[in-house]
Regions:
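Short, compositionally biased leader-like segments
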Residues: 1-12
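Active-site- and interface-proximal helix/loop "cap" or "latch" segments in soluble metabolic
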Residues: 15, 19-31, 36-106
Length: 106
């Protein structure tokens, strides 16, 4: 197996009790693959019940510098994301960012 130059990190959060994601999965997860050199998000997925949710969020995150997303994510979600899991997306990203920073310290 060749050298891997990315890191995989998952963020977790809760959604509303009546949200379909909560009813189906119990919690909301977002997974990021981040390039070690450029710090760009090269792959993304999340728990979802509607495929368009993951498709939309992929467009938000792919190609962006992972640590810089925190500077604009809340505003972008407020303007462009009308899903009931908006707060969960922000919390899951910040959880993933915290885990990623911990991994980068090693």
């Amino acid at each position: 197996m060749g050298a891997v130059h990315t890191r995989f990190v998952v963020g977790e959060s809760r959604t509303n009790a009546d949200n379909a994601i909560t009813k189906t999965y119990g919690t909301f997860y977002m997974a990021f693959e981040v390039d070690d050199e450029t710090l760009e998000v090269v792959d993304f997925s999340c728990t979802h019940t509607i495929d368009t949710t993951q498709s939309f969020l992929r467009k938000v995150f792919l190609g962006e510098r992972f640590p810089d997303i925190d500077n604009w994510l809340e505003q972008k979600l407020s303007e462009r994301y009308g899903g009931s899991s908006r707060k969960a997306v922000l919390v899951a990203y910040r959880d993933a960012l915290k885990r990623w920073r911990f991994m980068m310290e090693d």
